Swiss-Prot record:
EC code: 1.1.1.262
GO MF annotation: an example: NAD binding
Name the record gives this protein: 4-hydroxythreonine-4-phosphate dehydrogenase
A single Gene Ontology CC term: cytoplasm
Keyword list, A-Z: Cytoplasm, Metal-binding, NAD, NADP, Oxidoreductase, Pyridoxine biosynthesis
Compartmental location: Cytoplasm
Subunit structure: Homodimer.
InterPro entries the UniProt entry points to: PdxA, PdxA_fam
């Protein structure tokens, strides 16, 4: 008995960035076409204008807008050539409208999951939407108190799947020691365990946790957080096998070996990084074109590519759609395992 293909909403992101381009490229891929019923959330004029601009420039195939199912947002926005690669408050406002519409329709049951193309946070702010990013909007609209950013990538070399959750997300580095409380780390671990068990089907997960300081504090000589509370919290955490706190610089050696298929390194089922760049530098070094942002703690599946709007190359036809493709495929895969 075949499993019905899931229904996904795919937002255009900021229309002045590469979002519309990578949407057209991803939807031209037969693997993407066959994995789910995909509806693009946005303005059809944006897709049509992007298609006209790129059809003679793009080395990769583009899906024709006429054949793409659309949920029209009717924002009144018109994509003009002068806006592409620049963006403004108007493009920020419509990208917010696309996301809000996708979430509302998903909560109403029209879709089972959402895949979001990139937005520009500073243009949201110009438009009056003071959110750190799309993740926080999703959480607020779905009334999700605890949520997290997990980055998932499957190696094309070995087939090993890397999973990295961030304990803190879009905050300045100087605020991390204050924001990173025992309660925050415990909540992140709970989110990670829940996702590994219920989303990925791993009943008894092993989780590696990075220290905050160089050498995981060196017994309090290079920082106090590990000695004062982090080590004890991890030792007494009862819902998974925990490795850590591990030195943040060497924790990523085994995942790198597993990614490249080198030897048989001891790898965890997932890795907890304590701040944004601690987790995303290794993820992007290993899997920039393949990593997917999976939001944990929501009542629906949400994925996105792990890159931004790339205004510097928008409108040139050279943007790669691989990360968006992987985001669509992962959402479809997870919904196939856990249909709702």
């Amino acid at each position: 008995m075949s499993i019905p293909r899931p229904k996904l909403a795919l937002t255009l992101g900021d229309p002045a960035g590469i979002g519309p381009e990578i949407v057209l490229k991803a939807l031209a891929d037969p693997e993407v076409q066959s994995c789910a019923h995909i509806t693009v959330v946005g303005d059809r004029q944006v897709l049509e204008a992007t298609y006209r601009l790129l059809r003679d420039r793009s080395p990769a195939p583009l899906a024709h807008p006429a054949g793409i199912p659309m949920l029209e947002c009717d924002t009144g926005f018109r994509l003009q050539p002068g806006c592409i690669g620049q963006g403004d408050a108007d493009s920020g406002a419509v990208s917010f409208a696309y996301l809000r519409t996708a979430v509302e329709r998903t909560l109403q049951g029209e879709f089972q999951g959402i895949v979001t193309a990139p937005i520009a946070k500073y243009l949201w702010h110009r438009a009056g939407h003071r959110f750190p990013g799309q993740t926080e909007v999703l959480a607020q609209l779905s009334r999700s108190e605890h949520y997290g950013m997990m980055f998932v990538a499957r190696s094309p070399h070995s087939g090993w799947q890397m999973r990295v959750l961030l304990a803190t997300t879009h905050i300045p580095l100087g605020q991390v020691p204050t924001v990173l409380t025992p309660e925050r780390v415990r909540t992140a671990l709970d989110l990670l365990v829940g996702s590994l068990r219920h989303t990925f089907g791993i009943p008894d997960p092993v989780i590696a946790v990075a220290g905050l300081n160089p050498h995981a504090g060196e017994q309090g000589q290079l920082g106090s957080e590990e000695k004062e509370w982090l080590t004890e919290l991890l030792r007494t955490y009862a819902h998974a096998q925990i490795w850590g706190p591990l030195p943040p610089d060497t924790m990523w050696l085994a995942p790198a070996q597993a990614w490249h298929g080198q030897g048989s390194p001891a790898v965890a089922d997932a890795y907890l990084a304590l701040y944004h760049d601690q987790g995303l530098i290794p993820v992007k070094m290993l899997a920039f074109d393949r990593a997917v942002n999976l939001t944990t703690g929501l009542p629906f599946v949400r994925t996105s590519p792990d890159h931004g709007t790339a205004f510097d190359i928008a409108g040139q036809g050279v943007a790669r759609c691989e990360s968006l493709k992987q985001a669509i495929l992962l959402a479809a895969e997870l919904l196939g395992k856990n249909p709702s």
